[in-house]
């Protein structure tokens, strides 16, 4: 096992300085960025892994217990956390070593203010979810003292677990086209990360390829109320004379609000536009809504399992270079929109 003393000898710096930097205390001790980079580079080159059993955490965990922090944004995505949490717990139950999960809520664009992440004194590793553009820039510019895995984000120097966001949008557009739709509207919130933009871009590209006219998009709040109010407003204005054949929703929550608004206005059964959502909410809510909601399913539980595997792999020294994993997605047809043609005969 590579020691702090060996790293100090490699770079010609005192062991105490190396210990301060690897312990996340460099800023408060005013150690230069150049020195920090030299130490981190040597640690990576030599394959240094922190001695987790010896590290003393303020939380008072046992010598063999690993503390993994889950950073989750304090916004509309808070309601989506349970599915991810369930996936983490299911995977942790398979491991022999005890792992304690700790939730750290944070405000988008302010991840850099999370001392638990930058100090390394409260946890052995972290899974960062919902990072914004500014948060990703912070991560790219920073050498963190603990292993980090990103959920559904890509950043140089970090392990990550992702899905093909372009394909998510494309599958929805193809399903609409296969159901004979000619016009489609989009209900989504303002994009807070590149994946949201990619989903809509994929939807437009695939829609245009199949002759689907995509109506001008206007953003709404990401939630049930946001979907309800967006559809109610459009029914009084631009959709008053002519409904679109289809509506693609950026989240399950937006879709449930949209369905309520259509129902109140008398658009039920065959009168209802085809509707597909990015399936990021509870699966039961989508399956048992009236009508049941067709989704391009986001496999959050599976992504969580992969995240914790990458965390443990880094802590055990099995993963020493950043690794990204891309998980498959699928379209789940229900009552709000029928199947893709290739599956229609099955």
Model-derived regions, located:
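Short beta-strand segments enriched in small/hydrophobic residues
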Residues: 15-20, 58-76, 183-190
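Alpha-helical recognition/docking segments in bacterial nutrient-uptake
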Residues: 62-174, 178, 235-239, 253, ...
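Flexible loop/turn connectors
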Residues: 236-346
């Amino acid at each position: 096992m590579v020691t702090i003393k060996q790293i100090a000898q490699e770079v010609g710096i005192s062991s105490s300085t190396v210990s301060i930097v690897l312990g996340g205390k460099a800023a408060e001790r005013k150690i230069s960025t150049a020195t920090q980079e030299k130490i981190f580079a040597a640690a990576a080159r030599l394959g240094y892994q922190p001695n987790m059993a010896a590290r003393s955490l303020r939380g008072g965990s046992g010598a063999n217990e690993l503390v993994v922090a889950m950073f989750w944004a304090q916004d509309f995505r808070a309601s989506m956390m349970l599915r991810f949490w369930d996936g983490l717990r299911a995977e942790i139950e398979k491991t022999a070593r005890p792992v304690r999960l700790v939730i750290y809520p944070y405000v988008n664009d302010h991840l850099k203010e999370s001392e638990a992440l930058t100090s390394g004194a409260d946890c052995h590793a972290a899974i960062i979810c919902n990072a914004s553009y500014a948060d990703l820039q912070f991560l790219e510019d920073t050498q963190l003292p603990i292993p980090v895995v990103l959920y559904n984000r890509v950043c140089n120097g970090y392990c990550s677990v992702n899905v093909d966001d372009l394909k998510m949008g494309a599958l929805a557009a193809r399903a609409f086209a296969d159901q004979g739709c000619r016009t489609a509207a989009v209900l989504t919130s303002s994009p807070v990360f590149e994946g949201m933009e990619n989903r809509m871009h994929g939807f437009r590209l695939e829609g245009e390829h199949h002759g689907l006219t995509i109506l001008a998009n206007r953003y709404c709040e990401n939630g049930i109320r946001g979907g309800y109010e967006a559809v109610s407003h459009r029914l009084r204005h631009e959709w008053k004379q002519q409904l679109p054949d289809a509506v693609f929703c950026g989240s399950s929550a937006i879709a449930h609000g949209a369905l309520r608004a259509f129902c109140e206005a008398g658009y039920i059964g065959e009168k209802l536009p085809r509707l597909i959502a990015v399936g990021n909410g509870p699966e039961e809510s989508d399956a048992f809504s009236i009508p049941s909601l067709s989704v391009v399913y986001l496999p959050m539980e599976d992504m969580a399992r992969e995240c914790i595997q990458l965390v443990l792999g880094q802590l055990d020294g099995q993963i020493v270079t950043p690794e990204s994993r891309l998980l498959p997605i699928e379209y789940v047809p229900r009552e709000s929109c029928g199947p893709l043609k290739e599956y229609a005969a099955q």
